[in-house]
Structures are given as C-alpha cells and as structure tokens.
UniProtKB/Swiss-Prot annotation:
Keywords: Cell inner membrane, Cell membrane, Membrane, NAD, Quinone, Translocase, Transport, Ubiquinone. NDH-1 is composed of 14 different subunits. Subunits NuoB, C, D, E, F, and G constitute the peripheral sector of the complex. SUPFAM superfamilies: Nqo5-like (SSF143243). It comes from Rhodopseudomonas palustris (strain TIE-1). This is NADH-quinone oxidoreductase subunit C. The lineage of its organism: Bacteria, Pseudomonadati, Pseudomonadota, Alphaproteobacteria, Hyphomicrobiales.
C-alpha cells in the first residue's frame, strides 16, 4: 500500500473512532494513529475485529520519555494486519499519574510488555492481573528508562563472598570524573593551537 492508501486507511480508522482517535500521519511507509490512552482497549478491539482492518497480530508495545512535555510519556503499540499486509503504530500521550487500561483481554501477548512499561518507565497499567516489576529487582528504586534516572543508579548490587548473599550498597565511583581534551594539532588547521605546541606556527 502506498502513502496515499495508508492516508486513506488512517482517515477511515479515525472516522471509526470519533472522539477517541485524534489524528493520524504517514511516514516511512507506515501509518501512525494518535489516540486517547483511556480508550486504548476500544481502539485495539476495533483494529482487531473490524473486517476492514483486521490488525490481528500484536507485535510489541513500548514507551518514550519526553520530560519537557506536560504529558511526559508516549506509549506506543505496533500491530500487524495479514489481510492488508500492513503495520500500524498506535500512540497515546500519558502523564506520570495517568492510568492506562490493560489490553491483554484483546491481545494476551501484551502481558509482559505492559509489565516492562511499568518497570522501566513507571507507567501504571490498570486491570493487569500481575503488575509486578519484570526486569529489575523487587526492591529496585525508580524506573531506569526515565531520562531523569541517574546513569549510575542509586545502589549497586553484588554478591558478597563472605556473607554468601547478594548485598546492596551505595554507588561508589572508584575514579573521579575527568574531562579529556580530544583536540589534536594533527587534525587540521582549523583546530586551535594546543599549549606546548611550539611548531604550531611553523609552515613547511
């Protein structure tokens, strides 16, 4: 399907979801829908069951953190329609306290993806039967894919051979931060003269 066909498909889907789908776009040969996060179950059910669309295959779900936005996160779903031989991306903006309904009643395969979104971003999925952390430890502090999460984390976890158990300790940086000067006099004349480069002004 070319871009015009995808645009027509997007208009048809948006028209079938009045007040729920707020827009669509086509880029790089793929259709993207923007929807209301609170109505995501209705969106998924229509995309799966409507004979015009039949997006019956759930591919994945993820999120993106945009700290500068009022609605900080963008939750993203990808579906595939074997009937149309097309994919669709479904996006919804959510805030830190927005409750997003689980879609596992429509696509059971979304189970662990929803747990991952909670674990790594802190997005709360309601109606999920087992909303526990998935990739981090039970006592983990914070959500590591948020852009304000420190690169070093808050604690380090290691196995202590003396105590014969895993222990948690404050992060220790064994080497102080160093700033390196990567400028080189051999990279070309546009570079500034480095201190101690006595031959900088000599031309052969």
């Amino acid at each position: 399907m070319d871009d015009n066909g995808l645009d027509t498909l997007g208009q048809t889907i948006v028209g079938a979801l009045p007040g729920i789908a707020t827009g669509h776009s086509v880029g790089f040969g793929q259709l993207t829908l923007t929807v209301d996060a609170g109505k995501i179950v209705e969106v998924m059910r229509l995309l799966r069951d409507d004979p015009r669309f039949r997006f019956i295959s759930f591919i994945d779900m993820t999120a993106v953190d945009y700290p500068g936005r009022a609605e900080r996160f963008e939750i993203v779903y990808h579906l595939l329609s074997p009937k149309l031989n097309e994919r669709v991306r479904v996006k919804a903006e959510v805030g830190e306290t927005t409750l997003v309904p689980s879609i596992i009643e429509v696509f059971p395969g979304a189970d662990w993806f929803e747990r991952e979104a909670y674990d790594l971003y802190g997005i709360v999925i309601t109606g999920h039967p087992d909303m526990r952390r998935l990739l981090t430890d039970y006592g983990f502090d914070g959500h590591p894919l948020r852009k304000d999460f420190p690169l070093t984390g808050f604690v380090e976890v290691r196995y202590d051979d003396d105590q014969k158990r895993v222990i948690y300790e404050p992060v220790r940086l064994n080497q102080e931060f160093r700033k390196f000067d990567f400028l080189s006099p051999w990279e070309g004349a546009d570079y500034p003269v480095l201190p101690g480069d006595e031959k900088a002004g000599v031309k052969s």
